[in-house]
Amino acid sequence: MENLIANYPINTCENEFMLPIEYLYNKEELSGDIINDLELLNNNNNKNNKNNNNNNKNNNNKSLYDYVFDSDSIFGDAIKGRWSNYYTTDVGFLKDSQKLYESMYDIEMYSINEEKVNDILMTIEDNTDFEERNHYIKDVYLCDKMNQNESLMTWYSCFLVMSPILSLCLPIFIMIMPLFIIKSQGVNISTKEYFKLLFVLMKKIPIGKLLEIDWTNANSIFYAAISVCAYIFQLYQSFSMCLSFRRNMVSGHDMLYALREYLRNTVYRMEAYIGLSKNYESYANFNKDLSDRMKQINGYVDILEDLPQSKYMIPKKIGKIRCEIYKLYTNNAYKEMIYYANNFNGYLENITAIGKKMGKQMTKANFKTRFSNLIGMYYPAIVGDKKANNVQLNDVKINNNQIITGVNASGKTTLLKTVLFNVILSQQIGCGFYKRGKIAVYDKIHCYLNIPDTNGRDSLFQAEARRCKDIIDSVEEHQDKKHLCVFDELYSGTNPYEASATGYAYIRYMSKHKNVKLLITTHYLDMCESLLKAKQKSITNYHMEAYYDEANKMVYTYKKKKGITKIKGGVEVLKNLSYPKSIVKEATELIMGGNMNNSK
């Protein structure tokens, strides 16, 4: 076991496990902008969150990944964040993943106690004064080797257990021992004569004063009482240490026993997983590492195999238990091994959740296509954990550059997020939230969503311009790569006149690159009209449908239609927020008049 552990470098424990996608050569790092703008992760995606409520009332607290990787365990939550690291253009891997996830029903999920193991890890991570609290040898030469010596630990543990008896018998031992020493020297003295002489000598030392207490003298009585109390206190300390040692031994035994059962069941899970994925070439490197780790874990399980099941049988293996507890606390390789097992179990839980959703909420992607075509797609945060029956589905064919207009709250931004999330998801796990999906895999994915009001010293427009320039630089640098660029409200941080002009120029520039596909939302209708007049064949205008009903109330269909919107709906938002009627009326009159010349 020591050799197996020594073969693995000790890095940060949580980062030792890697998802299969991280072993690929053809992988791309997902930018932090996309992760933040799409809200792929949130504070719920960490290993300490035990309250992952799936109730739809709490959907606002869930990240997008929470709808993909359902998790009721600490380990499943802890590993979610790693999925956001990469996406891939390796179609073979994505197809293998689809088959693997579908077959997860065939794997026998041996039960594991995540919370118990997590508590154990928290205990061994807090190893302050560990040696002192657990009565190990410390601050002496070779103490580390001593604490890992099974025979020495057996004798030392026996001494700790016997300490109360030794303390109780020590005075008697002190009185009798000189008799044997004297007789061994050939001195002829009877036992009676020895104790008579001992009694006389002891009267001459302070402790011997107890033998002739003057019960009429307060000082004599006080001295006797102090001496007796000191002896009793010494006995109390010895008994307390013995009880503490026993509690620690029982706790340590329970810890090792729980770890053994957990790691054994984890090995069974690993064997089952390798059996399912062994024929998938793209998983070969992951499986090789997994197999090596499995041997390491199995070796540790074998070491713990002869642990007594009952705490009453601990004395038989007391030295071994002490050594293994010490190694668990002090050897980082053991912690690394447990973390790897935890992360694997979290990964297994995540992909099992995907398998359960495939064919229901999620559908496998088809990658044999020249352009992406998502049919019946939806945004999972709107639907929640139920099937998409009562939500408007949309189709998006990304065979050209698209500009989408529409009134406020008509669903423009949600449409962009839906496309972006489903494309990313399809290039991570091979499926997405749609009825049918054809994905032309993209080498580079860029987004421009939720630009912050300030970026360091930048104004909003400067932050927007900086993000757009970064995208230009990437397109110029990787002209042989396929790019998908998603922009929400392009250049909205400046006045409408300049925003329309710069947006028009930017879109025309980007649309010249045949390897780039643009999806853009905007409120600047004059920019859309200008692009239409310029007869840019690579650009198509769409809008999110909305209309006024007979009661002059805005109705949102959330359907994507061809053409530029003709509806103005900003004032409708003010109505819905119960603005003063005078504000709504004056704003409406100015809009209907087409200018503000008549305002007072």
Language-model regions, residue ranges each:
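ATPase nucleotide-binding head domains, primarily ABC-like/P-loop NTPase cores
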Residues: 354-600
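Intrinsic structural disorder
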Residues: 1-13, 61-68, 79-85, 90-93, ...
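Alpha-helical coupling/stalk and coiled-coil linker elements that connect catalytic or binding modules
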Residues: 2-50, 56-407, 414-444, 477
